Amino acid sequence: MKLKVLPPTLRKNNRYLALDIKVKSVISKDDLVNIVWNGCIRFFGENGTGNFSLWVMKFYELEKTDEYNHYQAILRCQREYVDEVRASLALIYKHNRKDISVSTIGLSGTIKACQKFIEK
């Protein structure tokens, strides 16, 4: 039996956050997933974070210098929890005992529109 696709009116509405990440060590997309999830869990707990529907859609490695590595990413979350996700991302400051800065540089309803905030 084939499952039916949900019509657009019944789907959950997503928003896409463009993130700017500066860290003193090298990170991968998997590391960023752990950083984001751990930051949200510390601030809102597992029950609250489970509702966010977080997903790292794209990950860009921009620049490596002696002082820091510069990355940008697109993060998906549910529309109702955008403010909570932004608040928990602002509180992230350490990863593996290295300084890290995560800031939101843009918010959009589609991935294509969110990519205009990303420097390539």
UniProtKB/Swiss-Prot annotation:
GO biological process, alphabetically ordered: tRNA 5'-leader removal
Protein's cellular compartments: Cytoplasm
Main localization category: cytoplasm
GO CC, any one term: ribonuclease P complex
InterPro entries: Pop5/Rpp14/Rnp2-like, Rnp2-like_sf, Rnp2_archaea
Gene Ontology MF terms in the entry: ribonuclease P activity
Annotated SUPFAM superfamilies: Rnp2-like
E.C. designation(s): 3.1.26.5
Quaternary structure and interacting proteins, as annotated: Consists of a catalytic RNA component and at least 4-5 protein subunits.
Family classification: Belongs to the eukaryotic/archaeal RNase P protein component 2 family.
Function (record text): Part of ribonuclease P, a protein complex that generates mature tRNA molecules by cleaving their 5'-ends.
UniProt-recorded name of the protein: Ribonuclease P protein component 2
Gene, per the UniProt record: rnp2
